[in-house]
Regions:
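Secretory/extracellular carbohydrate-interaction modules
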Residues: 179-244
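Short tryptophan-centered beta-strand motifs in secreted/extracellular beta-sheet-rich domains
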Residues: 61, 199-201, 265-280
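Blade-edge beta-strand/turn elements of extracellular beta-propeller
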Residues: 31-52, 83-102, 153, 157-160
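Structural motif
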Residues: 22-31, 78-84, 130-134, 143
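Short, small-residue-biased leader/transition segments that mark boundaries at the very start
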Residues: 1-5
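Short, aromatic/His-centered strand-loop micro-motif at the edge of beta-sheets
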Residues: 245-268
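Ligand-recognition surfaces built from glycine- and aromatic
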Residues: 295-321
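Short, solvent-exposed beta-strand-to-loop segments that form ligand-recognition rims
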Residues: 284-300
């Protein structure tokens, strides 16, 4: 699939392609055609040919301000949506430090503009047999990110306002601190979340803190849950089952995102859980995941070997009618 764009007196068509040859060769590329009448097309060669992937899927192209953005879904074991940026359609196409919009579970999206907002619609993939242990398979549930431009020209994503405002019963928790210098400690902030809710909090951690994060669908008695865990020393966050036992309790390869984690900096966390889909946003960095087993209905925050300050903590359950 490709896209058509009007450029001055002609149209530009981009398509995902690869070179003829063995499928093991990573010759994926985006190619271009031009036309003046939408009937007769001239092949113009490569639009972007990085030789990084086996194939380019779902190529997309749009402009915000001075920057052009070219999106493809990488046909690889990671199956991520990635982008490059340029101030010219002739390139060069620059790779930002974080070139993705989401993780392994978000795939084959396209963008459109609605009321001045750039909306990215992609698939949150299902897992084979609806089982946490199994691999992701094609298709699933459509899910929208709003794409926005940062000051440096790179792209972030956030929850579309209409989605965030669709929830009903909000409960706010008093600000608190988890001070746990020698072990891991959690604080439960909601006990009966149900299977559709949103969560928001601002968090700050101190120097030396090893990990912190959010747990949901938690059974407090069994200490079993799903969690988004922020590994401070690794500058990334990961979705996983807790405990990951019997090994592995969840196939989570690719369910992680890079995020620079700085002591004393305030991070805004927003999360939506809708049945088996969990989506988290942290300062413009998003991650989708699937959670099928649902051990319980508690929601908690945790930290290990350090201190975590939590403010603006809110849980909202159900949808407005």
């Amino acid at each position: 699939l490709g896209d058509v764009y009007k450029r001055q007196d002609q149209y530009l068509l981009i398509l995902g392609a690869r070179l003829q040859g063995p499928k093991t060769r990573q010759t994926g590329r985006t190619v271009k055609f031009t036309s003046k009448d939408l009937k007769n097309w001239k092949f113009e060669g490569d639009f972007w040919a990085p030789d990084l992937y086996t194939m380019h899927e779902m190529p997309d192209l749009f402009k915000i301000g001075d920057w052009w953005y070219h999106i493809v879904t990488e046909y690889s074991d990671r199956s991520k949506m990635v982008y490059r940026m340029s101030k010219s359609l002739e390139g060069p196409w620059i790779a930002p430090k974080d070139d993705a919009f989401d993780g392994r579970a978000y795939y084959a999206g396209r963008t459109f503009e609605l009321n001045g907002q750039r909306i990215l619609f992609g698939w949150v993939a299902t897992k084979d047999q609806d089982d946490d242990d199994n691999n992701f398979i094609w298709a699933g549930t459509f899910m929208a990110h709003e794409v926005y431009q940062r000051e440096d020209g790179t792209l972030g994503v956030r929850i579309p306002e209409t989605v965030w405002n669709a929830f009903d019963k909000e409960e706010k928790t008093e600000d608190f601190v988890i001070d746990t210098p020698t072990k891991s400690t959690e604080k439960v902030v909601a006990k009966d979340t149900g299977d559709i809710f949103k969560f928001e909090a601002d968090v700050e951690f101190t120097e030396g803190t090893r990990t912190f994060g959010v747990r949901f669908y938690e059974d407090e008695d069994k200490a079993e849950s799903y969690q988004f865990i922020f590994n401070v020393t690794e500058d990334r966050y990961v979705f996983e089952k807790k405990p990951n036992w019997p090994w592995p309790a969840n196939q989570n390869i690719g369910l992680e995102r890079p995020l620079e984690l700085v002591p004393g900096k305030k991070y805004n966390i927003k999360m939506i859980v809708d049945d088996t889909i969990a989506t988290i946003y942290v300062d413009g960095v998003a991650l989708n995941a699937r959670a099928y087993k649902r051990p319980g209905e508690s929601l908690s925050l945790f930290a290990s070997e350090g201190s975590l300050k939590v403010t603006n903590c809110k849980v909202t359950t159900g949808l407005k009618k």
